[in-house]
């Protein structure tokens, strides 16, 4: 038709050329914005290149050196990992995964999933959680799943910031039955050409959990484990949190050391002296990883609610079958891209059951800015960093500033979201 002809003239010389672009069809302003963003991200992906893995963050703790690295992927999520290397007293660094005690978080994560699923169960061994209204994460810290109620709540969350879900797999896409004989050898996975975006919601959830929803390997099996799962850790600096160690020394009563001393911080240190050391790092897959500093295994992963709302950005139908052998792809995005900050705070916080305490107690609070992932942040209580049936990390609140629509979104401890419109140059918080 006329529009397809105009699209062809504006993008390529001859019909059928690899750089030809289809007509943009959008039914709403939000869908048009998402479509245009997908095209812009495709153009950037085609022009961008890195020649080698990049080291983006380094911390030194005791006898360990931790380094975050990522590798650029042109039409997909960039691949990241944290490497632990032994650091000897003479400052010699012993690298290599064959050295005892060294690990790669990306390798450990994939092994963790394979070990958990080897018994034929659907358990992938991960605790991935967020905050959803009326769906508590307490007890298992694993509500970022495709269970009906969870998926419906996550779907509602994805529409909160006006990002539209695009239909990646449909009746005419690369992995549909209509393309089987032409573009792919047999045998192949089940037909995944479902029209509509219900499968995209489940697909994004499963992609976060490690499945190959976008068919990176081109075999049209979209429920298999990807060869690499952890997203890139780019601007987010690593932080290690173990036993509380803030100072109680002071020279006058206006110092924080004095405040700690007179308010029972020493008892808090004693009660948590054996607390497991955890590496916290934000990745652009959209999660905050909590990684055991000794083993490299992921203890849990938190998807901030306002980052979950932006996950539709990853979908780009223009990457469907974009690879030389029909491989699919997705947009690289900024997720949890800020650097976590920790502090021990005396306050009326939440108890292990998520209820407000009667009196102030000490808590280890983790502040998680989104960085380039968006103008927002989440605040967690990581006093108890290991998931157990009766205790674990707690969400306190999250905030997102939509400076385009002039709205501040606030998610409370249970995931209930309120909207506050700008008032002149301030925000109404009453």
How should these model regions be labeled?
Residues 1-430:
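A fold-level detector for beta-propeller and closely related beta-sheet-rich head/sensor domains
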